[in-house]
């Protein structure tokens, strides 16, 4: 879905999540994929975290009056193909970003919301008209970072009670189908036979985690979701529709990574409920 959306030449891709959830890293990864000699890319950032070859990067300086909105206004006049805005923080930046997406640019940016569906009311709060929102936003990625297990871990299996408890938070059938489809578990596997892992305390007393990895939910803006936005639907209605169209929630993506031995159920639950 993400690669498909990146190959659109206009519209907007949003990454959402709290501070420190890796949104900027995701934006830089997208820029890296798109950064070919024939494409003109410009960014407005606060701060510039990485210098990227061939990309025209502008640092926001509010103390001299250079805000995201000012930077974006200047960039669009240079007619780049792709614009990255570090964050949409206010109504003016939202309006300019939407306008850039409407006038033949691919716009990448971030928002502070807890879920992919939450990006819709956030933009509406910033006075973006629903018809403009549905004509520009192509994709929303919500994300969090979870700690990764180190090599010191032990395998275990869920009890029936554990599976029932998990079923209150995720769609068990859909998540299991994704595990089978990606060949993490063989076809015909039941939840009782899906391996999970927990950290073993190492001899030096370290906790068994090292590094972090993203867990994601990726919501494409389908025609059904467009209709819901135009009708003023709630975040939960939009989320429900996206899930019915096959979106794995962040929690489901986290459980998917648990079954791969990358992280633990406890870690995913802790991060998602924060």
Predicted regions and their residues:
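Short, flexible helix-loop junctions that flank or precede catalytic/ligand sites
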Residues: 1-274
């Amino acid at each position: 879905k993400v690669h498909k959306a990146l190959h659109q030449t206009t519209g907007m891709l949003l990454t959402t999540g709290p501070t420190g959830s890796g949104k900027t890293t995701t934006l830089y990864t997208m820029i890296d994929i798109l950064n070919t000699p024939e494409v003109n890319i410009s960014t407005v950032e606060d701060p510039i975290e990485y210098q990227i070859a061939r990309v025209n990067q502008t640092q926001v300086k509010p103390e001299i009056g250079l805000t995201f909105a000012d930077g974006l206004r200047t960039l669009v006049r240079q007619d780049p193909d792709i614009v990255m805005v570090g964050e949409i923080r206010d109504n003016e930046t939202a309006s300019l970003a939407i306008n850039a997406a409407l006038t033949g640019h691919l716009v990448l940016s971030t928002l502070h919301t807890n879920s992919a569906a939450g990006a819709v009311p956030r933009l509406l709060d910033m006075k973006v008209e629903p018809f403009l929102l549905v004509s520009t936003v192509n994709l929303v990625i919500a994300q969090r970072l979870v700690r990764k297990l180190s090599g010191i871990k032990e395998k275990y299996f869920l009890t029936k009670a554990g599976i029932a408890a998990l079923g209150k938070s995720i769609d068990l059938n859909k998540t299991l189908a994704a595990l089978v489809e990606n060949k993490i578990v063989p076809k015909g596997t039941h939840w009782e036979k899906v391996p999970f892992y927990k950290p073993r305390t190492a001899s030096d007393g370290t906790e068994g985690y090292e590094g972090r990895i993203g867990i994601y939910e990726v919501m494409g803006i389908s025609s059904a979701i467009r209709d819901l936005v135009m009708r003023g639907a709630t975040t939960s209605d939009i989320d429900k529709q996206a899930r019915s169209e096959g979106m794995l929630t962040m929690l489901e993506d986290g459980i998917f990574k648990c079954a791969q031995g990358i992280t633990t159920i406890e870690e995913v639950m802790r991060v998602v409920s924060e």
